[in-house]
């Protein structure tokens, strides 16, 4: 039998076989937590020294060693070993190599259970802040673009069919509002992430006279977890993030679907920058919206990370179980995927060309003004249901002879109602149709201006 040399190996007579060790190790991915692990250790050892659990001299030596490791990490000079399993054991092993056996006192009153939970809270807190900044940029980009296109008229769609003409600025502001709610969800997520598990130890707390409020302050958490079992057992703050990330990616994906359509030959509403397009290896003419397609495709990946962690957690008894090692890769992957997707979307919007004339022209060769005619008839005293039927029949007739509602002679309109006047032709123009939709939150130009003004105030307040 080979003696077990792990830091936890005292109870064991033999070592893990190499292939089993590789299966159980997490250092290949949890090394992303290295800066957070060292930061948490710095707070922990500071507290140990100030509460006289270890001597001030010992605390000073450990802090000096941690500073050396932090400098080496920033310089890319730390090498991690699979034999040390995870980031926590790797850091402790490296610290021992730097300062000797006194490094072993760092783990006093601490378990890897509260250690990893603390690292993950610190990591996610950091990434939530970064993500919200990127969302702020995206939302600002949308407002700027909307302001430039208040008077750009495009078809509004239901069932992918032309429905009513709208302001392109209004369409963009719809996404602004979606991404604002995404930001609010991340802010609420931050509240549940901004808690300190440090000091919960393995599951039951510790017999040492630790000061959890001190480490909470040192790590800039809002407050410590009030229950040690809860602190080390749950990953709901990550599940909440993955859920919020999934909703955010869904919004990005919907927008990308529209961008993909709009830059097609059939629409030609926009032209994407070459920076966000690719070509074909066989078809020389192709300009493909690959970045938008990738965001759309990666949405399923983020959904998968959410379902994966929910499945891991669904039957776990309290407290810690090794299954929880599977909580990290999906979180890391989703953080990276969502962050780059937000950045790409913002830059794609900033650099695209809007083909205003084509958007406008597409509203002149359709029947998206049919509701305007029905509303006009209703305003002249025709019951709306009757007006709806009349206009439906007119659309059918026009469809058969290749004409549009604005082509019908006034004389024919006046056979329907003598109250119809020449102003009907102005009413039927797309610009007028948009302008008249001036109800609160509507697509009317004045309403879009109000939406933009409100958005500017919101952005300024953040």
Curated annotation (Swiss-Prot):
Enzyme class: lyase
One GO term (biological process): L-arginine biosynthetic process
Protein name: Argininosuccinate lyase
Subcellular location: Cytoplasm
Keyword entries, A-Z: Amino-acid biosynthesis, Arginine biosynthesis, Cytoplasm, Lyase
Family of the protein in this entry: Belongs to the lyase 1 family. Argininosuccinate lyase subfamily.
Pfam families registered for this protein in UniProt: ASL_C2, Lyase_1
Entry's EC annotation: 4.3.2.1
Pathway the protein contributes to: Amino-acid biosynthesis; L-arginine biosynthesis; L-arginine from L-ornithine and carbamoyl phosphate: step 3/3
Reactions listed under catalytic activity: 2-(N(omega)-L-arginino)succinate = fumarate + L-arginine
InterPro entries (UniProt xref): Arg_succ_lyase_C, Argininosuccinate_lyase, Fumarase/histidase_N, Fumarate_lyase_CS, Fumarate_lyase_fam, Fumarate_lyase_N, L-Aspartase-like
Coiled-coil region list: none
Gene name of this polypeptide: argH
UniProt-recorded Gene Ontology molecular function terms: argininosuccinate lyase activity
């Amino acid at each position: 039998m080979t003696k077990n040399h792990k830091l936890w190996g005292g109870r064991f007579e033999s070592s893990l076989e190499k292939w089993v060790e590789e299966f159980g190790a997490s250092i290949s991915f949890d090394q992303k937590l290295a800066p957070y692990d060292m930061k948490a250790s710095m707070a922990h050892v500071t507290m140990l020294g100030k509460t006289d659990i270890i001597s001030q001299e010992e605390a000073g030596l450990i802090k000096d060693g941690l500073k050396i490791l932090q400098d080496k990490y920033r310089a890319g000079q730390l090498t991690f070993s699979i034999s040390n399993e995870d980031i926590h054991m790797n850091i402790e092993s490296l610290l021992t190599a730097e300062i000797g056996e006194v490094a072993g006192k760092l783990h006093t009153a601490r378990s890897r259970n509260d250690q990893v939970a603390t690292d993950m809270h610190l990591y996610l807190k950091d990434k939530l802040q970064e993500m919200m900044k990127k969302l702020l940029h995206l939302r600002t980009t949308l407002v700027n673009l909307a302001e430039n296109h208040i008077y750009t008229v495009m078809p509004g769609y239901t069932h992918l069919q032309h429905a009513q003409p709208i302001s392109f600025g209004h369409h963009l502001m719809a996404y602004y509002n979606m991404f604002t709610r995404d930001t609010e969800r991340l802010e609420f997520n931050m509240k549940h992430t901004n808690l300190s598990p440090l000091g919960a130890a393995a599951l039951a707390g510790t017999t040492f006279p630790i000061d959890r409020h001190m480490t909470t302050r040192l790590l800039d958490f809002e407050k410590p977890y009030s229950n040690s079992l809860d602190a080390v057992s749950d990953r709901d703050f990550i599940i909440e993030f993955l859920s919020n990330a999934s909703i955010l990616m869904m919004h990005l994906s919907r927008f990308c679907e529209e961008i993909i359509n709009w830059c097609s030959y059939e629409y030609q509403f926009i032209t994407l920058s070459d920076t966000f397009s690719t070509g074909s290896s066989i078809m020389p003419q192709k300009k493909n919206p690959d970045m938008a397609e990738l965001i759309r495709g990666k949405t399923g990946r983020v959904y998968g990370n959410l379902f994966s962690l929910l499945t891991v957690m669904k039957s776990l008894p309290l407290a810690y179980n090794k299954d929880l090692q599977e909580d990290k890769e999906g979180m890391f992957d989703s953080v990276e995927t969502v962050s780059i997707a937000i950045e790409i979307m913002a830059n794609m919007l900033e650099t695209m060309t809007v083909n205003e004339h084509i958007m406008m022209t597409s509203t002149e060769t359709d029947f998206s003004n049919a509701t305007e005619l029905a509303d006009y008839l209703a305003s002249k005293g025709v019951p709306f249901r009757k007006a709806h039927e009349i206009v439906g029949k007119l659309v059918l007739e026009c469809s058969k002879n290749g004409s549009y509602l604005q082509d019908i002679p006034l004389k024919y309109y006046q056979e329907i109602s003598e109250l119809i006047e020449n102003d009907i032709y102005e009413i039927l123009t797309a610009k007028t149709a948009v302008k008249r939709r001036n109800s609160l939150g509507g697509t009317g130009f004045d309403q879009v201006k109000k939406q933009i003004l409100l958005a500017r105030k919101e952005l300024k307040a953040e």
